[in-house]
Amino acid sequence: MDKVKIALQYMLPKHLLSRLVGKLAAAEAGTLTTAAIKWFIKQYKIDMSEAAQSEPQAYKSFNDFFTRALKPGIRPINQHTHIMVHPVDGAVSQLGPIKEGRIFQAKGHHYSSLTLLGDQAQDAKRFEGGDFATIYLAPKDYHRIHMPIKGTLSKMTYVPGELFSVNPLTARHVPGLFARNERVVAIFETEHGPLAMVLVGATIVASIETVWAGTITPPTGKQVFTWEYPTVGPDAITLDKGDEMGRFKLGSTVVMLFAKDAIDTFAEGVEAEAVTRMGQAFANLNNPK
C-alpha cells in the first residue's frame, strides 16, 4: 500500500491540484466554508480553545482558519539568552550535524545542503560543519512560523520545484524530498552566526508567506529568484525571538540550518519524532562569537 501511495504522488498533477485547492481554500463561501472548517476540526481533533477566534463561523475562508492566530500568551517564549526556541508547533522529523554538505532525511536517504539552498554556493559554505533540524507540521498544527532566535534578514531565495507530500511516509521513500520540493529560503544574521529558515512547500500547500514580502508562492516557474536585504540602517528587517516570520496556507515542513558551533546541545527531549511547541526550549546555544 505504501508503494501505491508513493507511486500516485509521482503521477498526480501536483501543481495543478495545489492551485485548485488554494482557490477553494481562499473562497468565502459562508455556510459551506463553516461546514468545511467544522469537519476539519472534528477530523483532526483540533483544540480550538487555543485559538484567538474559537468559533468556526468567525473565519471568512478556510485559509483564515488554517492560519489562525493563537490567544496571546498561549505559547510563552523562553527568553533565556542562551536558549533557542522551537519555531513552530509540529514534530521533529530529523536533526543532527551537517556532514560534508549532506543532510539526513530518513534511513537510506540524504540530500545536499547546497541543493536545498537553491544552489547558492556561498550560502551553503556558511553552514558547513553546522547542524540542521527538520520539523513537520501536520494538518492539525498551528501553521504560523516564528523566529527561534533574534535575527536580521539578509537574503531570501525562492526555489521552484515539485510538490510532493512531506509526511513521514514520503520522507522515507522519496529521495532528496526537501531539496526537490518548492521552497523559500530565508537567511538571517544572528549573534550566533547565520541561520537559514527553509519553508518547504507540499501537495495542496496553496502558498508560502513571509511577514516582510507577503505571498511568495504561487505563482511558480522554473527560475530561482533571490532578494537581498540591508542588515543595517532604517530599512533593516530585524525580528526578535518568537516573532512571526511566515506562515503556510495548508501544512508543510520547516528545515533550519545553523552555523558551526552555534549549538552546544539540543534541549532535553528534542529528538526525532518528538512533539514541538512554539516558544519552548529547542537548543542550548554557545556563547556568541
From Swiss-Prot:
GO terms for molecular function: phosphatidylserine decarboxylase activity. It is a peripheral membrane protein. Binds 1 pyruvoyl group covalently per subunit. GO terms for biological process: phosphatidylethanolamine biosynthetic process. Keywords: Cell membrane, Decarboxylase, Lipid biosynthesis, Lipid metabolism, Lyase, Membrane, Phospholipid biosynthesis, Phospholipid metabolism, Pyruvate, Zymogen. The record marks 251-252 as: Cleavage (non-hydrolytic). The keyword Nucleotide-binding does not apply. Its cofactor is pyruvate. Its main location: membrane. One of its GO terms (cellular component) is plasma membrane. It is found in: Cell membrane. It catalyses: a 1,2-diacyl-sn-glycero-3-phospho-L-serine + H(+) = a 1,2-diacyl-sn-glycero-3-phosphoethanolamine + CO2. Its EC number is 4.1.1.65. Pfam families: PS_Dcarbxylase (PF02666). The active site is at 89 (charge relay system), 146 (charge relay system), 252 (charge relay system), 252 (schiff-base intermediate with substrate). Catalyzes the formation of phosphatidylethanolamine (PtdEtn) from phosphatidylserine (PtdSer). NCBIfam families: PS_decarb. This is Phosphatidylserine decarboxylase proenzyme.
